[in-house]
Design a protein with these regions (language model features):
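Hydrophobic transmembrane alpha-helices
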Residues: 1-70
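Short helix-perturbing small/polar motifs within transmembrane alpha-helices
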Residues: 2-12, 33, 92-142
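Residue-level signature of transmembrane alpha-helical entry/exit and packing/kink sites
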Residues: 16-24, 48-55, 67, 98, ...
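Alpha-helical transmembrane segments in multi-pass membrane proteins
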Residues: 23-34, 55, 59, 70-78, ...
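Helix-loop junctions at the membrane-solvent interface of multi-pass transporters
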Residues: 33, 37, 61, 87-88, ...
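Interfacial aromatic-anchored transmembrane helix boundaries in multi-pass membrane proteins
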Residues: 36-47, 75-109
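Membrane-embedded alpha-helical hairpins and interfacial helices in multi-pass inner-membrane proteins
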Residues: 44, 120-200
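Structural signal for the C-terminal ends of transmembrane alpha-helices
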Residues: 61-65, 112-120, 189-194
Length: 200
């Protein structure tokens, strides 16, 4: 074994191309599974879901490159018609809808979570991992709020910044804070399953 392989026994490792491809597929599937836990809110087109937990954990566990690939696969599957988006949604129209920015932000967030964890939390310290998850979550909001504002503008609706935050940030902030903490707690177990020490 070398420095990039498991420090502990693993379910499978990432030492071959086929296993990395499997890990990418599992990461995409994990996000798709959590996306089915969705709670629509009456005052916003953005639902509450668990998929952000999957995005953060997949990115941090797989690493920046494989994590981003997993989320690209997830988006491709949904755009192709598989019911993997929130609540079983599917179709390319989702990428142009009110939640399209959030979906596109998943790729950036997975990459950022992986990159930051590899750089600052490879020693398994929970606080740096938690901060990395928060930064990755901020990337989702940056893309998501921009996409939501663009969608509303195209629909002929005007919204102020406070109004935009009321639709696309504040209802989800506490839950996403908790999901970031949970992802940081679960990360060592995910690394163990993948046979990772913190870096690929």
């Amino acid at each position: 074994m070398n420095a990039t392989t498991a420090l502990v026994p693993s379910v499978f490792d990432l030492n071959t191309t086929s296993r990395r491809a499997l890990a990418v597929a599992l990461g995409a599937g994990f996000v798709a599974l959590l996306a089915q836990v969705a709670l629509p809110l009456p005052f916003t087109p953005v639902p509450v879901t668990l998929q952000t937990l999957g995005v953060l954990l997949a990115g941090a566990a797989l690493g920046s490159r494989l994590g981003a690939q997993a989320l690209l696969l997830y988006l491709a599957a949904g755009a192709a018609g598989l019911p993997v988006f929130a609540g079983g949604g599917a179709g390319v129209g989702w990428l142009a809808g009110p939640t399209g920015g959030y979906l596109l932000g998943f790729v950036a967030a997975a990459w950022l979570a992986g990159a930051l964890v590899e750089r600052f939390a490879a020693d398994r310290r929970p606080l740096p991992a938690f901060l990395a998850m928060l930064a990755a979550g901020a990337a989702i909001y940056a893309f998501g709020l921009a996409g939501l504002a663009g969608w509303m503008a195209l629909a002929g609706k005007t919204v102020s910044l406070p109004g935009l935050l009321a639709l696309g940030f504040w209802p989800f902030a506490l839950g996403d804070l908790l999901k970031a903490g949970l992802a940081a707690v679960l990360l060592p177990a995910a690394w163990k399953g993948l046979g990772r020490s913190g870096r690929i």
